[in-house]
Amino acid sequence: MELCVISTTTTVKAINPFLPSITRRVSSRLFQSDSVLQFGGRLKKPISRPLDMSCVSRKIGFFGDFMSHGGNFRLFAAASPAVETSVKEDKLPADLKVTETVQANSSVKLSVEVPEIVCEDCYQRVLTEFMKLSKVPGFRPKTRVPENIIVGFVGRQYVLRATVESILKRTLPHAMESVTGRALKDSIQIVSSFPDMEKAYSKLKTLSYEVVVDVVPELKWNPEDGYKNMKVVVELGDEIDAKKACERQLRQKYKSLGALKIVTERGLQVGDLAVVDISATTIDEDGSTGQAIPDAESKGFHFDTEEGNRLLPGFLDAIIGIRAGESKSFTLVFPESWKQESLRGQRAQFTVDCKELFYRDLPTLDDSLADKLLPGCTTLKEVEETLAKRCQEMEQEAKEQATDNAILEQIRKMVEVEIPQSLFEEQGRQFYGARLLEIQGNMKLNEDQLASLSSQKAVNEFLETQRESITNIIKQNIAVGDIFKRENLEFSTDELVKEVENSISEFKKHKQEFDEERVKDQVQEILEGAKVLEWLKDRAEIQYITR
């Protein structure tokens, strides 16, 4: 039940088990948020050189895009000849006219006009390729075939489509030269309809088309250089206090040794475990019943009363004394610090049905339980000391995590940047993929469930509901990268090589597929982030307060 959790906590992130030690530590701070997980996804890189032909066909996805518009283009795409030459080697017989229009969300529209002489040259190349590939009756292979015969043999419509494709594949790299160094890879989209281009070319023997491409977003700091002398307030919850955490862990381990017995002669008291059904509705200002609160509904919820301080304030007190089979209704107000903003300050009517009630029959806590509490220990003192050491390490890690989160959140608020749509979608899909892996790791999904969760509809819903969180993380990543460049920070090649090797060995150890270049990109970004956080913390004024 979403409501029955502590409302304000220090976030300790889940960590990708396949990343090495330094990578795990840093990536858990840099690339995760309260609502989405990211395992160090690399931001898109700008295209640093003009696209060549093979790059066009591989990266832009002509075929997939056009097939939705061009009827039987799938067959044509598979069989049509392609001229794969670099921009420098393939000099066009005339210049293209390219008009650049800046659009929202760091994108640029390129309106491309291809002269008739270029179109004719592409047409002749297509005919030549078909002559090489076709076995025309009455003509020897690879010999010159009259235009009307080869067109009739191949099919006029087929030649037309092949010519339009040839024009696109040949001219697009030249058209993209104006955004070389700024264009984000995998973001290029031809927005003109393929059938419309076919019709236009067949009538005019020239071709015009439009391309939209995302470019590296321009970052503005407000205030300028504000990140250099930040004042950061870090809120720490008492749940990360080493002493209290140690006490909680020891208590949990001790409770696990007790037997649960049914309560028969009394009502609920602190220390018991209750199985309850919970429902809640909002209360309007006029006192009337409002809408149900889905996140508060739970059937068969196992409520440990010793964890009552981690619930909605007043919830435990309201049900003390309830007996099995009884029902209680009561009103509570969500505090202003509640995690879900929409519920802050909201009055709500709760109904709790107690199904079962248990108490723990605990053994005497002495040295005889030491090994059961913590294998390898012989005394309670040894158990306490071992747990205390672990909790102190966890406290330090949680404190560092909270500090990094606070710094990243502050620099995010300092930057103004338009996020390209392709970048948002790429990062969002990475987050969703990580979320899906997490779900699969926690429960067994059947084929129908997996198909449903993997559907485009599910992904799109995730992107929409998590838009703010995804955008915030991207802003953090962009800000971190900008600081790294601005301040000329660097890390050694040895560090990079070592961490890449460690990451790859972990992937191999767990028999996970990986792309070595992508792993290198991820590790590089993580190391950059570590250097930036270290640099920022050395110059920031940091104050810690406990909630």
From Swiss-Prot:
Localization (cell): Plastid, Chloroplast
Enzyme Commission number: 5.2.1.8
Keyword match Disulfide bond: no
One BP annotation, GO: protein transport
Entry keyword set: Acetylation, Chaperone, Chloroplast, Isomerase, Plastid, Rotamase, Transit peptide
Stretches assigned to the PPIase FKBP-type domain: 271-366
Residue interval of the organelle targeting sequence: 1-77
Gene Ontology terms: cellular component: chloroplast; chloroplast envelope; chloroplast stroma; plastid
One MF annotation (Gene Ontology) recorded for this entry: mRNA binding
InterPro entries xrefs: PPIase_dom_sf (IPR046357), PPIase_FKBP_dom (IPR001179), Trig_fac (IPR005215), Trigger_fac_C (IPR008880), Trigger_fac_C_sf (IPR037041), Trigger_fac_ribosome-bd_bac (IPR008881), Trigger_fac_ribosome-bd_sf (IPR036611), Trigger_fact/SurA_dom_sf (IPR027304)
Record has Plastid as a keyword: yes
Main location: plastid
N-acetylalanine modification, residue list: 78
Catalytic activities: [protein]-peptidylproline (omega=180) = [protein]-peptidylproline (omega=0)
Domain notes: Consists of 3 domains; the N-terminus binds the ribosome, the middle domain has PPIase activity, while the C-terminus has intrinsic chaperone activity on its own.
Family that this chain belongs to: Belongs to the FKBP-type PPIase family. Tig subfamily.
Protein purpose: Involved in protein export. Acts as a chaperone by maintaining the newly synthesized protein in an open conformation. Functions as a peptidyl-prolyl cis-trans isomerase.
Protein name: Trigger factor-like protein TIG, Chloroplastic
Native source species: Arabidopsis thaliana
